[in-house]
């Protein structure tokens, strides 16, 4: 009997502990939404912010024009800011929908979307409008993936969940020298009774280099400190004409995590490989990866990968880079070298020798050496192109120490401009 009593005494606390854990897990899940769509949650109060009811204040929607359609849209004058949301927490933003009257490349890069959490002065998100919503180059595309959608090429949808404990503020800034005459929007969010300390804050960083340096990796995400999760990237490339139509996507994705120095923990095998394709990169749209712009005639590509089912967490620091590397036959590379094209040979493929390493940091190999494979041997080389990217990530804090967004001249360089909208 004593033996059974001991077992019962030991088990009761364990059972209570497990029950509490189960309740805590359920409460955490319920904070976002119930596990089943037919379950009720007392922790969630839905809100929609639009011009018809900024912040979605209770019982104050559609008050203009005697409850008819009174304020569905507005304008953003040159140099002004348009407030989409400015509310107190805790809460979670679940969806953002926006459409605008002008969608030229200059407009999509001239507008900036900023997001602030917990009354911080520096935005956690500061990205060109078009790039933020999943397509770069100042272009639009008809698509739907796990984070973004543009059903008919005329609207911009985000489904990224963005928790905030104390406050959330979202604005669109018109940095163009003309007015934007039409903007419609909805920011759909929910107020919460309970904040979960495991929630992280959403951040996004955009960067463009109009002429990358051969041998220097492009920074998708400069080193950011804190605990967090790299959510993915939407990247764009405009290739330089001096490389003709030779393949540009041999560069490898790299993730430097938690103390990595010269070498990363995560490394890919090629640009098109990183987004799930192979042997070149055409246009396609998948749930987690795709290439929405593949315009060989104009030498432009815009592509994405979102790490939803393969999360990249970090505990102290994270840096994400992409090499800018291409490839073609050895004879083509030699011809470019003789014309003074900016490149550095990296590898050459021999039939029997396999992949031959020919990259040296202090010198450039002589490709005409008789010791190397023949003229048709595939040769990879560092190159210089116009590259830009959005890095989407979560941090355990509402602000980051990343640089401010680049100015409108850099953002819109060589993009089509409209004189007015």
Describe each model-derived feature in a short phrase.
Residues 14-30:
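Bacterial Sec-dependent signal peptides at the C-terminal "C-region" and cleavage site
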Residues 1:
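S-adenosyl-L-methionine
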Residues 25-421:
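Beta-strand-centric surfaces of beta-sandwich/beta-rich domains
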Residues 4-14:
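Sec-dependent N-terminal signal peptides
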């Amino acid at each position: 009997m004593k033996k059974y009593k001991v077992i019962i005494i030991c088990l009761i606390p364990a059972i209570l502990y497990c029950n509490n854990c189960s309740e805590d897990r359920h409460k955490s899940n319920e904070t976002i939404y119930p596990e089943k769509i037919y379950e009720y949650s007392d922790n969630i109060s839905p809100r929609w912010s639009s011009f018809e009811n900024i912040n979605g204040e209770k019982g104050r929607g559609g008050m203009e024009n005697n409850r008819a359609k009174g304020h569905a849209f507005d304008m953003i004058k040159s140099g002004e800011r348009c407030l989409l949301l400015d509310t107190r927490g805790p809460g979670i933003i679940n969806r953002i929908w926006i459409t605008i009257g002008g969608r030229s490349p200059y407009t999509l890069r001239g507008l900036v979307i900023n997001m602030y959490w917990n009354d911080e002065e520096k935005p956690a998100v500061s990205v060109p409008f078009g790039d933020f919503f999943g397509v770069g180059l100042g272009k639009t595309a008809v698509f739907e993936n796990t984070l973004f959608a543009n059903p008919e090429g005329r609207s911009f949808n985000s489904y990224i969940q963005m928790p905030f404990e104390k406050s959330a503020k979202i604005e669109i800034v018109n940095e163009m020298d003309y007015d934007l005459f039409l903007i419609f929007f909805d920011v759909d969010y929910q107020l919460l009774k309970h904040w979960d300390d495991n929630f992280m804050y959403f951040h996004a960083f955009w960067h463009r280099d109009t002429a990358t340096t051969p041998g220097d990796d492009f920074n998708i995400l400069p080193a950011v400190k804190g605990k967090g999760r790299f959510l993915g990237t939407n990247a764009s490339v405009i290739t330089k004409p001096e490389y003709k139509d030779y393949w540009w996507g041999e560069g490898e994705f790299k993730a430097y995590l938690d103390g990595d120095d010269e070498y990363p923990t995560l490394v890919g095998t090629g640009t098109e490989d990183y987004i799930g394709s192979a042997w070149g990169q055409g246009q396609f749209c998948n749930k987690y990866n795709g290439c929405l712009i593949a315009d060989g005639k104009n030498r432009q590509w815009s592509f994405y990968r979102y790490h939803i089912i393969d999360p990249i967490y970090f505990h102290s620091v994270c840096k994400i880079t992409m090499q800018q590397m291409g490839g073609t036959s050895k004879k083509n590379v030699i011809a470019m070298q003789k014309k003074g094209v900016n490149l550095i040979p990296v590898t050459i493929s021999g039939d029997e020798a396999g992949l031959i390493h020919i990259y040296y940091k202090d010198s450039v190999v002589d490709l005409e050496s008789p010791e190397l494979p023949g003229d048709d041997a595939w040769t990879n080389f560092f190159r210089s192109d116009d590259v830009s990217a959005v890095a989407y990530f979560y941090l355990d804090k509402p602000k980051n120490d990343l640089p401010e967004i680049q100015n409108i001249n850099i953002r819109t360089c060589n993009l089509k401009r409209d004189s007015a909208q």
